[in-house]
Amino acid sequence: MSKDIRVRYAPSPTGLLHIGNARTALFNYLYARHHGGTFLIRIEDTDRKRHVEDGERSQLENLRWLGMDWDESPESHENYRQSERLDLYQKYIDQLLAEGKAYKSYVTEEELAAERERQEVAGETPRYINEYLGMSEEEKAAYIAEREAAGIIPTVRLAVNESGIYKWHDMVKGDIEFEGGNIGGDWIIQKKDGYPTYNFAVAIDDHDMQISHVIRGDDHIANTPKQLMVYEALGWEAPEFGHMTLIINSETGKKLSKRDTNTLQFIEDYRKKGYLPEAVFNFIALLGWNPGGEDEIFSREELIKLFDENRLSKSPAAFDQKKLDWMSNDYIKNADLETIFEMAKPFLEEAGRLTDKAEKLVELYKPQMKSVDEIIPLTDLFFSDFPELTEAEREVMTGETVPTVLEAFKAKLEAMTDDKFVTENIFPQIKAVQKETGIKGKNLFMPIRIAVSGEMHGPELPDTIFLLGREKSIQHIENMLKEISK
């Protein structure tokens, strides 16, 4: 790299951290760390109507939970919030006004709406038409005086070079260009309330903070020519741009929408459900990028080492909840028990299940969990009198030899003394039933498993029976015998 790498994640504090925004932050983070550059966070809080109390803290907290750190932010540097930089924006607005590259616009919302309606009826492309068009200097001065006397507060618009071509080589999509005449006319750079518009403030901030590369979602492609216009007007060199493809729902094939209620889309949701941050980090890193090869499980350090911006995908990234759950399960299985038990404690405590056997239950079901909150439904059988059965389980229990197996195994449990009721002694009792009845394989193990746990699959059967306890195991078998005799 010929210049210092400085990249940024610039969220608006308007709500929770969405998976798409988390990906933007993560790719900027990986790019900076891979190249030994600087990763900074800037808060874009000029949209006061959408500002959410505590939104900034929530964004930073969830980024930290994912495992990201940064070199510069509002926490360590002054004026890293746009609301703290209004004087800087005003400086450049005044400069553009003085140079005739921008002007004050007194057109009202009603006049703009009427013009848009006229254009629509005429079949014209909607655009702002300079209100001073055709006016002499005297007429222009009289118009401004009349508007100011009426108390109309002006906006400031950038004078667009309609014949200009605004192009860049995108890091992801290759060469892109826009004609100046196709962006809707002179556009507002300062609103009536004195706040800058998004595209103006972003360009000023990126230049002032010496941002070398702007990596963001492709919904920002249409913003780029406007930002290039600001760079051109102020005589600045623009950063490089890279626009990541959108994220689609793997089930619908459509753009991931916040209305897709079947998909968890906010990092806060994953935190609350007990996903491991390393798993979510790993999953997001592969949304629109991959290092090549078949492997999909990578540590943060491995992802930093492997990250190559040239492998950013030009095709939409599919958000697959099943893949995330598979990946999360892999991380939970391989995590140490202490970590998962600590994560499980709040769920167990809320459900009244933080007993002396709680840690053993977590150990038993850790290999099955996709998220730690699943410890509650997975352990229902230990805290209920009779497990609910599926149709497939009921069909198994209609087998001719089922009562024989259950009666024989119940007798074995009843004969065991408390000191002999330990995990390693339970399997021999099942084998003894096999020897006595001649029933083996699935016809032996499946009825016992379903009667005791209410499931056809699960942890090792002796472990389940031991943790359930001798009396409760006997009770479950008795309940099942009553059920199948009806």
Swiss-Prot record:
Residue interval(s) of motif 'HIGH' region: 11-21
The record's subcellular locations are: Cytoplasm
Per UniProt, the short sequence motif 'KMSKS' region occupies residue numbers 255-259
The record ties this protein, via Gene3D superfamilies, to:
1.10.10.350, HUPs (3.40.50.620)
The record's principal subcellular location, in a coarse class, is cytoplasm
Q: Which reaction does it catalyse?
A: tRNA(Glu) + L-glutamate + ATP = L-glutamyl-tRNA(Glu) + AMP + diphosphate
Question: Could you name the domain of life of the organism this protein comes from?
Answer: Bacteria
Residues binding ATP are 258
Extract the InterPro entries matched here.
aa-tRNA-synth_I_cd-bd (IPR045462), aa-tRNA-synth_I_codon-bd_sub2 (IPR020751), aa-tRNA-synth_I_CS (IPR001412), aa_tRNA-synth_I_cd-bd_sf (IPR008925), Glu-tRNA-ligase_bac/mito (IPR004527), Glu/Gln-tRNA-synth (IPR000924), Glu/Gln-tRNA-synth_Ib_cat-dom (IPR020058), GluQ/Sye (IPR049940)
E.C. no: 6.1.1.17
Q: Name one GO molecular function term.
A: ATP binding
One Pfam family linked to the record: Anticodon_2
Biological process (GO) annotations held by this record are: glutamyl-tRNA aminoacylation
Subunit comment for this entry? Monomer.
Protein family:
Belongs to the class-I aminoacyl-tRNA synthetase family. Glutamate--tRNA ligase type 1 subfamily.
Which PANTHER family does the record match to this protein?
GLUTAMATE--TRNA LIGASE, GLUTAMATE--TRNA LIGASE, MITOCHONDRIAL-RELATED
Q: What does this protein do?
A: Catalyzes the attachment of glutamate to tRNA(Glu) in a two-step reaction: glutamate is first activated by ATP to form Glu-AMP and then transferred to the acceptor end of tRNA(Glu).
The name under which this protein is listed is Glutamate--tRNA ligase
